[in-house]
Amino acid sequence: MQYHDAMALINRLDSRDPGFKTALSQLLAFEAEQDESIDQAAAGILADVRRRGDAALLEYTQRFDRLAVDDATALEIPQADWHAALDSLPAAQRQALEAAAARVRAYHERQRGETWTYTEADGTMLGQQITALDRVGLYVPGGKAAYPSSVLMNAIPAKVAGVPELIMVTPTPDGVRNPIVLAAAAIAGVDRAFAIGGAQAVGALAYGTATVPAVDKIVGPGNAYVAAAKRRVFGTVGIDMIAGPSEILVICDGKTPADWIAMDLFSQAEHDELAQSILLCPDAAFLAEVEAAIERLLPGMPRADILRVSLANRGALILVRDLEEACAIANDIAPEHLEISTEQPQRWTALIRHAGAIFMGRYSSEALGDYCAGPNHVLPTSRTARFSSPLGVYDFQKRSSLIQVSREGAQTLGRIAAELALGEGLQAHAASAQYRLDQP
């Protein structure tokens, strides 16, 4: 078995090998390094923004983004500018954004929770009321790696949920705004946008300043400082998740073109050097074909340097006994993205319990899910799909319990509650229930 062989393009594992479980665990091991200096820097910035508000925001924006303005109100990007950005997009790009947005909206509209109630025989009504969050902050990274798809995936579910005010923050280094991000904000229904970024933007959204209103939840990806700041403000506000590196796991029966599978592995490996791309297949000859395809296609990729490191350190081609075993291994890995590139993918999907998104069949490339299929691309990473879910409408809605007890119901429930309260030594609880009992 090759594992972290300095010469290997990608690791080769075999599930029959006695050391397989250990090798797989090593391959999967990813500890998000909590860099103490980053955490301390974020904490200092948050405290400063909380204390000094707009003044701190202006200073940090000048220091980190080289953007100097006299007044914090100048950091707001007017809606007219977003619409101008939208109008200036090439027609094909605008059409692609609008088509993706329509699909994302159609999918998320099916997730909307509804208030429900039921009434018991004695007239007592119980239920659950669904309400949207009042105000949400959306962080969008700036600079070269601007992802308009991220705007659509975070903003549209919030608006479908009924969030009345959605505030986008995005850094504009040297004052340069990304027109496609602003265009996406216009399409997705964002309400306000500010040219701020980093831990200072997270602080402004969490605590509020004279210019930037405080929000109830902060969503969206960011760099290590943004992640550290989101971790620290959690509890004051809600957050979506702290995302780890991208992951793809492909289960293939050996009948999909090898080049397709190689490129699917590349699609995640190109994100960064810590991204993880793994193929599970029971056909050794096909694994060799995919390895040959990787070797052939890699030199032509613009991000070949990142791909090489990612595939050599965290990628793997794994020979399994059969597709049942592949599904069992997939459940253990709990991947962010899972492709089931087989005949009758439904059969194997039924065996999957833990995955962020499941791409079924040979034509369902993971890239389609990233951009325009409709389901959300904000997915649990680092094995957290064992207990968490994709971002969705439900992340922007809350549930309140409804309890309307009838006079008759109070007689039955009052006696039960009083008995339990006295058992816990809570006399006022008991009395509160007993006062409502009809006197004999």
Curated annotation (Swiss-Prot):
Q: How is the cofactor bound?
A: Binds 1 zinc ion per subunit.
Q: Which CDD domains match?
A: Histidinol_dh
The entry's keywords: Amino-acid biosynthesis, Histidine biosynthesis, Metal-binding, NAD, Oxidoreductase, Zinc
- From the Swiss-Prot or TrEMBL record, give the protein name: Histidinol dehydrogenase
Q: Which enzyme class?
A: oxidoreductase
From the UniProt record, which GO molecular function terms apply? histidinol dehydrogenase activity; NAD binding; zinc ion binding
HAMAP family per the UniProt record, alphabetical? HisD (MF_01024)
Keyword Amino-acid biosynthesis assigned to the entry: answer is yes
The pathway where this protein functions is: Amino-acid biosynthesis; L-histidine biosynthesis; L-histidine from 5-phospho-alpha-D-ribose 1-diphosphate: step 9/9
The UniProt record gives the binding positions of substrate as S246, Q268, H271, H337, D370, E424, H429
Q: What is its EC number?
A: 1.1.1.23
Q: Does the keyword Ribonucleoprotein apply?
A: no
Question: What is the scientific name of the source organism?
Answer: Bordetella parapertussis (strain 12822 / ATCC BAA-587 / NCTC 13253)
Q: Which family does it belong to?
A: Belongs to the histidinol dehydrogenase family.
Residues the record lists as binding Zn(2+): Q268, H271, D370, H429
Q: Reaction catalysed?
A: L-histidinol + 2 NAD(+) + H2O = L-histidine + 2 NADH + 3 H(+)
Question: What Gene Ontology biological process does one annotation of this record name?
Answer: L-histidine biosynthetic process
Q: What does this protein do?
A: Catalyzes the sequential NAD-dependent oxidations of L-histidinol to L-histidinaldehyde and then to L-histidine.
The residues that the entry says bind NAD(+) are: Y139, Q200, N223
Active site residues of this protein: E336 (proton acceptor), H337 (proton acceptor)
Q: Name the needed cofactors.
A: Zn(2+)
Organism superkingdom: Bacteria
Q: Name one GO cellular component term.
A: cytosol
List the PROSITE patterns hit by this protein, alphabetically.
HISOL_DEHYDROGENASE
What PANTHER family does the record tag this protein with?
Answer: HISTIDINE BIOSYNTHESIS TRIFUNCTIONAL PROTEIN, HISTIDINOL DEHYDROGENASE HDH
